[in-house]
Amino acid sequence: MNALELHAVHKSFGGVPAVQDISLSMPAGSRTAIVGPSGSGKTTLLRMIAGFEFPDRGRISLNGQVLADAQGAVPAHQRLIGYVPQDGALFPHLNVAANIGFGLTGKNPQRQQRIAELLDMVALDSSLAARWPHELSGGQQQRVALARALAQRPRLMLLDEPFSALDTGLRASMRKAVARLLAEAGVTTILVTHDQAEALSFADQLAVMRQGRLVQAGAPLELYQHPRDAQTALFLGEAVLLPAQLDQGLAQCDLGQVPIRERSLKGPARIMLRPEQLLVLADDGDGAGSCPGVVRDCDFAGNTCTLSIGVAGAGGHEQLVPVRSSGLHALPVGSRVRIRTLGHAHVLGAAPGA
């Protein structure tokens, strides 16, 4: 069953479209990440779901209830939607317990019990209940913000780049902890982020927006391996884009012959490979099934490195190809190597000028 349904949602500001005819379904209990460059409309879409903005046309429904359509809209405070902004937005004049309990009704013992449950749920020690926001670490502040958003048992959780202000190591651990917590609570969740790796690891469903439109939506692995176009391919990670000639399930390109899944395709096209699909081998004279190249740059990042390898391209021009490898295999500039492809190339469409 789908929890959230967006149907042809459109929003303009001053006559300039910000969100254009977005239709998207989110299954109950799922995690959807919405990604896109700045100005793509992802935050405006999130604000319309929350009730901070209203669509010019279209329909937003949650668990069968229409939240907004041409007839009107349910106010934000009546939607039972949790919202965690980028900075957590804790009240500085309230301690942790008061922040979490803000908006909770009921008698004090019941309220205190619920606060204790929420502290335990987000893995915060009960001793932190009396602390002030400025006495907490960034990760602790985000956990308090999440507990506050969960306090009233929301039907939907909205996360607006909640991990972006955290240190790299803490960001990864917090992302995993929050994903696990929300899955255990069974709360349908939407994450808006500009971090592609974060979106790929967090979500069950990935939605890519560009210029206010939904470009592609589906399972993260599907979008990463089979993007709809070159822009989406490059937005979701490094990609090797090459012109090729297709025939009988093979693509003839600057890297040699690469298999493709679409055996019926024939003629000029553009193909995509991810850097991890390229294997660097020593240039020992055995060229079978590989392509010669020269290391032009090595971007060393500790446990990994990205090699820029020059190979002979069309018309005698050198084509630089990024290859992702273990940091143990970082090679000096000028090294002669061979490249072997792994798996199938993805066909993006006709090559420029084809």
UniProtKB/Swiss-Prot annotation:
Enzyme class: translocase
Superkingdom field: Bacteria
InterPro entries xrefs: AAA+_ATPase, ABC_SmlMolc_Importer, ABC_transporter-like_ATP-bd, ABC_transporter-like_CS, ABC_transpr_FbpC, Mo/tungstate-bd_C_term_dom, P-loop_NTPase, Transp-assoc_OB_typ2
Enzyme Commission number(s) from the entry: 7.2.2.7
Iron among keywords: yes
Record localization: Cell inner membrane
Residues that, per the record, bind ATP: G36, P37, S38, G39, S40, G41, K42, T43
Keywords, alphabetical: ATP-binding, Cell inner membrane, Cell membrane, Ion transport, Iron, Iron transport, Membrane, Nucleotide-binding, Translocase, Transport
Protein name: Fe(3+) ions import ATP-binding protein FbpC
Organism: Pseudomonas fluorescens (strain ATCC BAA-477 / NRRL B-23932 / Pf-5)
Gene that specifies this protein: fbpC
